[in-house]
Amino acid sequence: MKSIVYEKKLPKLTALEIAKNSKKKVICGMSGGVDSSVSAFILQQQGYQVEGLFMKNWEEDDDTDYCTAANDLADAQAVCDKLGIKLHKINFAAEYWDNVFEHFLAEYKAGRTPNPDILCNKEIKFKAFLEYAVEDLGADYIATGHYVRRSDVNGQTKLLRGLDSNKDQSYFLYTLSKDQVAQSLFPVGEIEKPIVRAIAGDLGLITAEKKDSTGICFIGERKFKDFLERFLPAQPGEIRMVDGKVIGKHDGLMYYTLGQRKGLGIGGVKGLSEDPFYVVDKDLINNVLVVAQGNDNSALLSQGLMATQLYWIDRLPIRQNLRCTVKTRYRQKDVACEVIPINDDCIEVRFDEPQIAVTPGQSAVFYQGEVCLGGGVIERQIK
């Protein structure tokens, strides 16, 4: 199979490089999406022995309208058939439930806002999948459709942002070790998303125009609140202003996140302006949702944060203050900061400029230029 876009846009490998790659077996994670589809094709063009693997990480329930696993598997199989590669199938639902979903529920129950995609990458895609591919399928590498890059210079393996800044997914991969990165290939991390779709179109792949998946994988397109209340009992309570004034009722603290504006159910309040309300705190002890008005309200701002559960790509804890940049949520622009080590599993982070909606349970991920250094889970804000 050939793609004119691929031949025009991607660098050519030498015959020697292709011959070297031909001795290496790569198991490419096939999600049924366009990114993994094109990743498999690129690996083929680079000479690797390529096989696909479809992971089932969630058992379907009665809400068949929301579960796309069967459709995704069919698309992954169609792509592999078109490319002429074998597709393996594996069920990691038990591992996902134990290592990702139960943690997700525990964090929400504790009033924090976790990121299950980060935990899924840590526990499933770059642990269970990697181990299975290497030990059971004889892989030299795994590959995924993540928009990140790998750098190998002077024996040092580093994780870099994806070339397409709009699609960079390094934020979700900060828990990886340099050894895991060294065993992984990220073919689409070197190109931009429109080129990925153009290559898929050239090849006539069924996934060429398929919409990117959004939201949490096990929830799909259903309403988050409806899903969560099936597993955790809601505890309604009061909504109060920062000064303690009661202005409404909330449905349960777990349904709200810091900085949230929509869905608060607060109408016009007598004696107050028309400025929108934002969540600024969750008082777990008293079951109170605290709000303030205006997107520039000082109650929304944090001077820094404390983070724990640290993972550095090189697995070397920092011993002295570090100047770098940080993201406290996906798609946020980098913020200049200073990282102050407290111990091997706790850091203080001081922003150069105050930041809004720093949310416990989410991750703070650190960078120096293009290099992702690692990160940790936000324990609390520093006001």
From Swiss-Prot:
Official protein name in the record: tRNA-specific 2-thiouridylase MnmA
Assigned EC number: 2.8.1.13
Catalytic center residues: 120, 217
Top-level division of the source organism's lineage: Bacteria
Segments crossing the lipid bilayer: none
Disulfide-bonded cysteines: 120-217
Location of the region described as Interaction with tRNA in the Swiss-Prot/TrEMBL record: 167-169, 329-330
Gene: mnmA
Provenance organism: Histophilus somni (strain 2336) (Haemophilus somnus)
